[in-house]
Curated annotation (Swiss-Prot):
GO terms for cellular component: cytosol. One of its GO terms (biological process) is RNA processing. The gene is pnp. This is Polyribonucleotide nucleotidyltransferase. Its main location: cytoplasm. Mg(2+) binds at residues 497, 503.
């Protein structure tokens, strides 16, 4: 392909597309650039593999620190495993791409986005999403595109497209909208308790910009003479399909309307129908029977068509009767139960949230500022995280066995969503200096575990005494769309997620929304449907919130007795070196004396943590004495550190030393300093003078007994 360069003027900032310049052996490659942020996106297809019955799509987002002019840390000085942010961007690219491939496509597809250059203003993620669409089209992979994505921010009262990092961090909204010509395909957002109507307007605003980017891609395609690749669906074996319908439809309907069955009971009943009404009957057919021949040649044909029949019957029941497989109405939430303080107090806070068969146990742990997660090895401007949420999904939660491995992309993504939902209601660092980690253990899963983690996190935080601004709850909305018939489902369970068209997670407080995530299985939704889903989620969220507040209605006034006790103080930044001491000697001495942990920020904020408040107070007093301004005439108890011919040096507090001249050791003439003092002696001294260089001249003369007694008493408290 010849080189092609096109600049798109887009909302006051150019987006530049370079095609045919890099990666010539990739199926399709696009270098997409805005400002000094440039992302190379490639798409490559391989032939389908035998036995694959799903879309084998892999999306990887890669960060290189050279993009920001940096060299990686560590011994190897090379990028290691992708940071969490890179994994989340991989998912962000994947989610709007996946529904736009024909679901019958079985070719291996790999999309790789690599950030080659990055400035401090333009995030690379939405560029990568848009670039992925064009790369797939150029690779001639069947695709219902083009697709594009933009970010929407809220600065003051105005929505803006593709805000800078600074505008994102200071605004009340960080929303990514992706869309196709058919409508909205993906939404992801964090918001500062914004009303539903504001969110709807923001999505609509973003989709209008998405349409401009889609039109720009279509213009590029027309210029290059590129058309969308297509792939006809494989023929359906109508005779086998009709056989399965005839054999099972009535029985499946009975199971789907047997509302007292739980997930496991329903799955078992459906498996029994398939075995008795299909598999056993086929086994009894003559070898030459066309049904037996077809199902023998294609091993997974029965499973595939039985699932299709079940899917159509479930969807038909919802559309025509307005009743779901568990008997709920379309807008009804499953039964909810909550508990707090379930675990012993060694755990700082815990909350158990149950919704139907979904059960999530969330545990909150309070840590010190030194426990914050440093983010130095990625390209993004955030330095550290003070709130961390980790989501675990063990195999037993769905009654399965499989090897236990490190968290996968799904677990990282669900954890990040629940983390994002809570962030807007956390107290500031000044109000609550603790670093907080919440771990959500999914103990049983039947849909909406990420929103269960949001609810469990809220319960655990309040149980731990974290003064959150407002409690947060969440619900997952689903969709059944058949032509013009549309049904939106509240609080979807596993089968509705699996056989439905949408998973739209909405979290927030009674004031407004804090997080959104919408994923589709169809090629796009109109804004009317998106708006209705958001509006229908509100009463569900508030219902869930009422259930949670009936168990604990506000954060506990006291922390767990096993949580660390923190004290904060401010010192002059110029004094930081004094407190730390050479090689950390001084601060280490204080921590050892007081059995505390001390963290010092560059702005002079000192955070002291200890298991007991008295220990923290003692360390605070030591640091205060070290850093406060000394005055002439003040009396201290010190210890002799060294002796020279003309006097002795005395440390009156960690890191602060003064000298007693030989003439100030005693009344009358002193022949040798050693006649009066030895190294290690405790001595009461007065500050006689502070010279213009800040040096302390001390004396043992003229100290009243009451002054000496007060100094000894103060020293004893330390």
């Amino acid at each position: 392909m010849e080189e092609f360069d096109r600049s798109i003027s887009f909302d006051g900032r150019d987006i530049r597309l370079k095609l045919g310049l890099l990666a010539p052996q990739a199926g399709g490659s696009v270098l997409i650039q805005s400002g000094d942020t440039a992302v190379l996106v490639t798409a490559t297809k391989a032939a389908s593999r035998e036995g694959v019955d799903f879309l084998p799509l892999t999306v990887d987002y890669e960060e290189r620190l050279y993009a920001a002019g940096r060299i990686p840390g560590g011994f190897l000085r090379r990028e290691g495993r992708p940071p969490e942010k890179a994994i989340l961007i991989s998912r962000l690219i994947d989610r709007p791409l996946r529904p736009l491939f024909p679901h019958w496509l079985r070719d291996d597809i790999q999309v790789i986005a690599t950030t080659l250059s990055m400035d401090e203003e333009v995030p690379p993620d939405v560029l990568a999403v848009t670039g992925a669409s064009l790369a797939v089209i150029l690779a001639e992979i069947p695709f219902f595109g083009p697709m594009a994505a933009v970010r929407v921010g809220l600065v003051g009262d105005d929505f803006i497209i593709n805000p800078t990092y600074k505008e994102i961090n200071t605004g009340d909204l960080d929303l990514v909208v992706a869309g196709s010509p058919d409508g909205v395909v993906m939404v992801e957002a964090g918001a500062n308790q914004l009303p539903e109507q504001d969110i709807i307007e923001a999505i609509d605003f973003g989709y209008e910009a998405v349409r401009d980017l889609i039109a720009a891609q279509q213009d590029v395609m027309e210029t290059l003479g590129v058309k969308l690749a297509t792939l006809d669906p494989p023929p359906v074996n109508e005779s086998v399909l009709e056989f399965i319908k005839t054999q099972t439809a009535d029985e499946i309907k009975k199971v789907l309307s047997q509302y007292d069955l739980d997930k496991n009971g329903r799955d078992t009943a459906l498996d029994e129908i398939k075995a008795a009404k299909v598999e056993e009957v086929i086994a009894s057919l003559p070898e030459e029977d066309p049904i037996k021949v077809a199902t023998t040649e294609e091993a997974k044909l029965v499973d595939t068509l039985f699932k299709d029949v079940t899917k159509k019957l479930m969807r038909s029941q919802i559309i025509n009767e307005g009743v779901r497989v568990d008997g709920r109405q379309l807008d009804q939430v499953r039964p909810i139960s909550c508990r707090v303080g379930l675990l012993p107090p060694r755990v700082h806070g815990s909350g158990l949230f149950c919704r139907g068969l979904t059960q999530v146990l969330s545990i909150a742990t309070l840590g010190t500022p030194g426990d914050a997660q440093e983010l130095a090895d990625d390209l993004h401007p955030e330095d550290e995280k003070r709130y961390l949420h980790h989501y675990n999904f063990p195999p037993y939660s769905v009654g399965e066995t499989r090897p236990m491995r490190s968290p996968g992309r799904r677990e990282i993504g669900h954890g990040a969503l629940a983390e994002r939902a809570i962030l807007p209601v956390l107290p500031t660092q000044q109000e609550f200096p603790y670093v907080v980690r919440v771990v959500s253990e999914v103990l049983s899963s039947n849909g909406s575990t990420s929103m269960g983690s949001v609810c469990g996190s809220t319960l655990a935080l309040m149980d731990a005494g974290v003064p959150i601004i407002k409690p947060v709850s969440g619900a997952a909305m689903g969709l059944i769309k058949d032509g013009d018939e549309v049904r939106i489902l509240t609080d979807i369970q596993g089968i509705e997620d699996f056989l439905g068209d949408m998973d739209f997670k909405v979290a927030g407080t009674d004031n407004g929304i804090t997080a959104l995530q919408m994923d589709m299985k169809i090629t796009g939704l109109s804004m009317d449907i998106v708006a209705k889903a958001i509006e229908q989620a509100r009463p569900a969220r508030l219902h869930i919130l009422d259930k949670m507040l009936s168990v604990i209605d506000s954060p506990r006034p006291e922390l767990s007795p096993y949580a660390p006790r923190l004290l904060t103080m401010r010192i002059d930044p110029d004094m930081i070196g004094l407190v730390i001491g050479p090689g950390g000697k001084t601060v280490k001495s204080i921590t050892e004396q007081t059995k505390t942990k001390i963290d010092i920020d560059d702005d002079g904020t000192v955070t002291i943590s200890a298991s007991e408040a008295e220990q923290a107070e003692r360390a605070k007093q030591l640091i205060h004495n070290m850093t406060r301004k000394l005055n002439e005439g003040e009396v201290y108890v010190g210890r002799v550190t060294r002796i020279i011919q003309i006097g002795a040096f005395v440390e009156i507090m960690p890191g602060k030393e003064g000298m007693i001249h030989i003439s100030q050791l005693a009344e009358g003439r002193v022949g040798k300093v050693e006649d009066e003092l030895a190294v290690g002696d405790e001595v009461v001294v007065k500050v006689r003078e502070i010279d213009n260089k800040g040096r302390l001249n001390l004396t043992r003369l003229g100290i009243h007994p009451d002054e000496a007694a007060a100094a000894r008493k103060a020293a004893a408290l330390l």
